[in-house]
Each structure stands twice: as structure tokens, then as C-alpha cells.
Design a protein with these regions (language model features):
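N-terminal Rossmann-like NAD(P) cofactor-binding module of classical short-chain dehydrogenase/reductase
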Residues: 116-117
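Short amphipathic alpha-helix with an adjacent loop that forms part of the alpha/beta core around
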Residues: 104-111
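Glycine-rich, aromatic-lined ligand/substrate-binding cores of catalytic
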Residues: 217, 222-405, 418-426, 430-439
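Rossmann-like NAD(P)H-binding beta-loop-alpha module
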Residues: 176-225, 229
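C-terminal lid/capping helical subdomain adjacent to the catalytic/cofactor pocket in oxidative enzymes
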Residues: 435-464
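N-terminal secretory signal peptides and thylakoid transit peptides that target proteins
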Residues: 4-27
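N-terminal Rossmann-like dinucleotide-binding module
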Residues: 26-93, 172-175, 269
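Beta-strand-loop-alpha-helix segment that lines the small-molecule cofactor/substrate pocket
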Residues: 121, 126-174, 188, 432
């Protein structure tokens, strides 16, 4: 394990830092004090370097670490269960102490860090992020925020109680396109919106869905700690179909195409239309791979393709109408709008808004909106900006850790938005049945069998 001298500096510790420590203490029943003493979260002087620990150093986690480092953060500790997968990040940060178990890292580094980034598979997002929050640290977590609805609700509450700065990895939330989408819709450029279509071409060729559990049990690679990779999920033999990338298509580890891309796509209608929680959701799925030879639902992997229909009540005291939002994945898409001409086509991943005066569509990650018919653009050009522009997705969180300005996509927003995504994922457990959703009590009221999947039991040694 690489060793470096402790780089935490007493620096500047404001009254706000002491307040956050007290708030976290009250919320979680233990004492937190500033980093230079034991390691509570707080806000730094502009001149003080942010000290960060990274949980998940390969793949997206490695990309997050590289970007946040360029902003000026100092990664003093890195944790990954796969040395080969994380080798590039380890090499770029030779002085960072290395760990395999994030629980050990947080225990040993609590006095040295201000913040934690989490870039692991979906099934360990919650346990890693919650551990960091309970340690009083600011948290950046990749999308989707959690693997289950229960985890999402609990993590959102914990972040609020602790007063830490949080952000989820839906990069397009900071884009110019996302702000124009909000401003044009709210200015009435396409009129009243009651119908939305959102889609993704995933899983496609990127990972497999609609398949059964592999029967082969090859040896675990020497560089991988399979037990820690599983984390809180029930034990099963290693197979390369799961790690490092294919986990997205398996119920135990991922959230399917909807969970993987929904936070990049559904984010924008949820935000622009102020949708709030759905009142119901219903899925239809492909039969190929969805049913096993006993005519039972495939409990191992997600269907190859699905359509999920959400219903939302009217909002803002009746000023905003009810909305039906339909999600498509696995290559399924909504019909091409009649207003499209020539070689115009919908993007492979995106959103289509159907208004009373026209239509609007954009690509994933907050792509620039396009209007149908095109003549509506002249009206859109007259819409004055009403929203603050973002300095950048990662910059928002990085600056928040220093100045306490809450990021637009903090867990207070991204938590409920992720719940909407995960409710759609839940509906895949009961295709063809409309699930009535009680968001206050986090349960389906008319199909109680699916409530068992709102949270899954952790194996011994793991807790939220």
C-alpha cells in the first residue's frame, strides 16, 4: 500500500463547518469535528485545497477522479476492488494511499479528507455514499443515485440531515441545452405539454439483457476482490458477464437500460415540467428472455426491451396539466413526428415533448433543444434567460465544497428524480400491470408483491 505523509492542513474552519459537524452528530448519533481534528465536513477558504478520497477508481469513477483533480482537488486516498481496472488512476496519483475496502479507508482517512467521490457499480452506490455522509463528508456519486427505492429515500434524507454538499453524475443537468429546454417550455413556446416520450438505444450491443445466470464458474482474476465487489448483495460465483461492465443488465447489480440512462434523459422533463412523483407506472416488455422455461419472469436479468408509461398529476395548483411520459429502450422509439422533414430524425437517445402549439426534442445529457415546426425558433429567440447558468457539472460540486452554495443537482433534486427512474425499473417486475404509487409511504398500493423489491436484504456485514 502506497504511503504518503498526511496532507490535511488546519487551514480555515468556519462557523459553518462547526455547524455541519453538530448537525451530522445530531442526525446520526455520533460526534464529528473538523477535518484537522477528526474529520467533519465543512467549507474551505478559496485558497485551501480540497482533500478527497475516491471510492471506485476505474471506469466512470476514474473519469470523475481525473476531472475533479484538474479542478484543483487533491486525492489523498483511492479505493478499488480491482487493481487492474484502477491501474490508470493509481498511476496518475502515485502518492495516494490505496485501499480495497472503502469502510477501512473512511475509518483511517476520516481526519484527512473533506469529500468523497463514488464511482462504483449501482449496487454499492448507497452503502458507499451513506458511509461517507455518516463520516460528515461531502459526496459526489455517479448515477443512478442508488440501486433501490428505499436506498434512494434514505440517502436523500441523510444528506439533508448532515448538511453536506452532494451531487449526482447526471452531467447534462448543467448544460445550456437543459436551461433552454426549461425556459422555452415555461415560456409557452410549444404550449401546454401533456405528453412526453423519452428513449434510449441501450442495452443494445453494450451489454446483455434477457439472459439467464451463467453456469460457468471461472477463476476469479488475481487482481479482483470478488467478495468486496459483491458488497451487500447475496453471494454468487464470479463470471466475466458481471464485471467489469456487464453488471448493468443484471437485477442484483444494475438497473437496466432505464436505470443506466434514465437519469441522463428523464432528468430534463422532470425538471422542466416540475413533474414531481408519478402517481402510477406500467411496463410492457419483450417476451424473448423475459420468461424462463417455466413461464416465470426472469429474475436474473432485465428484459431486452421495454416500454414504461408514467402518469403524473396536475401540478402547481392546477396551473400545470397532468402528464403522460412514456419510456422506450432496447431499440424501441416513439413514432417520428409528422413535422420532421427531409433527413431529420430523432436522436438515438433523447426526449420528445408534445405541446398544444408544437413539439420539441433534444438528445441525451441535456442536448440543445430543437423545435417542430422550425418556425417556432423565432419565438424562442425572444425568450429572456431566467435561469442561472452553471460553471460546469463538476465545478458546481467542487465549488460547493468550498463555499456552501448547494449544487442544482444535489441529492435534494437528484434523489427524487432517481426515485422516478427506479419506479419505472420496479414496474419491469410486473409487466402489464399498472402500479399505483404511494410516494409518501414508498409503496405500491395495488400490487403488494412488488414491494419486496423496493429494498433488498443486505448480506451479513453490510448495512446502510
Amino acid at each position: 500500500m502506497t504511503e504518503i505523509s498526511k496532507s490535511a492542513s488546519p487551514g480555515f474552519h468556519s462557523t459553518r463547518r462547526r455547524f455541519v459537524s453538530s448537525a451530522a452528530s445530531a442526525a446520526f448519533g455520533f460526534t464529528l469535528v473538523p477535518r484537522h481534528v477528526l474529520g467533519g465536513a465543512g467549507y474551505l477558504a478559496p485558497s485551501e485545497q480540497l482533500q478527497v478520497a475516491g471510492i471506485g477508481a476505474g471506469g466512470m469513477g476514474g473519469g470523475d477522479i481525473a476531472t475533479i483533480s484538474k479542478l484543483g482537488a487533491n486525492y489523498v486516498a483511492l479505493c478499488d476492488v480491482d487493481d487492474e481496472r484502477a491501474a490508470g488512476t493509481f498511476g496518475a496519483h502515485p502518492k495516494a494511499r490505496r485501499y480495497r475496502d472503502f469502510r477501512e479507508m473512511l475509518d483511517k482517512e476520516v481526519a484527512n479528507i473533506d469529500a468523497v467521490t463514488v464511482g462504483t457499480p449501482d449496487h454499492t452506490h448507497a452503502v458507499a455514499s451513506m458511509a461517507a455522509i455518516k463520516a460528515g463528508k461531502h459526496v459526489y456519486c455517479q448515477k443512478p443515485l442508488t440501486h433501490t427505492l428505499y436506498e434512494c429515500r434514505e440517502l436523500t434524507k441523510a444528506a439533508k440531515a448532515a448538511g453536506v454538499m452532494t451531487s449526482m453524475g447526471n452531467q447534462g443537468h448543467a448544460s445550456e441545452g437543459s436551461r433552454l429546454t426549461n425556459e422555452w417550455i415555461q415560456a409557452g413556446v410549444i404550449g401546454e405539454v401533456r405528453e412526453v416520450h423519452a428513449w434510449s438505444d441501450r442495452a443494445g450491443k453494450l451489454w446483455k439483457q434477457g439472459i439467464g445466470r451463467p453456469s460457468e464458474t471461472p477463476a476469479v482474476p488475481a487482481t479482483l476482490d470478488w467478495n468486496l465487489w459483491l458488497g451487500p448483495i447475496r453471494e454468487r460465483p464470479y463470471n466475466p458477464a458481471y464485471a467489469p461492465f456487464g453488471w448493468r443488465g443484471w437485477w442484483d447489480f444494475g438497473t437496466g437500460a432505464l436505470g443506466d440512462m434514465g437519469c441522463h434523459i428523464i432528468d430534463h422533463p422532470v425538471w422542466a415540467l416540475k413533474l414531481g412523483a408519478p402517481t402510477s407506472v406500467e411496463a410492457s416488455t419483450t417476451h424473448d428472455g423475459t420468461l424462463n422455461d417455466k413461464n416465470e419472469l426472469n429474475s436474473e436479468s432485465f428484459p431486452k426491451a421495454a416500454i414504461v408509461t408514467y402518469q403524473f398529476h396536475e401540478r402547481d395548483g392546477g396551473k400545470l396539466p397532468p402528464v403522460t411520459m412514456t419510456w422506450y429502450d432496447g431499440g424501441l422509439m416513439p413514432p417520428t413526428p409528422a413535422e420532421m422533414t427531409g433527413d431529420q430524425r430523432l436522436p438515438d437517445n433523447g426526449v420528445l415533448y408534445v405541446g398544444s402549439k408544437g413539439k420539441m426534442f433534444h438528445s441525451s445529457h441535456g442536448g440543445m433543444p430543437q423545435l417542430l415546426p422550425g418556425e417556432l425558433l423565432e419565438q424562442a429567440k425572444t425568450v429572456a434567460p431566467t435561469m442561472e447558468r452553471s460553471p460546469g457539472h463538476y465545478e458546481e460540486w467542487f465549488q460547493a465544497c468550498k463555499n456552501g452554495k448547494v449544487p442544482v443537482d444535489s441529492f435534494a433534486y437528484s434523489g427524487p428524480m432517481t426515485e422516478t427512474v427506479l419506479l419505472g425499473v420496479l414496474s419491469l417486475r410486473a409487466p402489464g400491470r399498472r402500479l399505483l404509487w404511494d410516494t409518501a409511504n414508498l409503496k405500491v398500493t395495488n400490487v403488494p408483491d412488488v414491494n419486496q423489491y423496493i429494498h433488498t436484504e443486505y448480506r451479513k456485514g453490510w448495512s446502510l
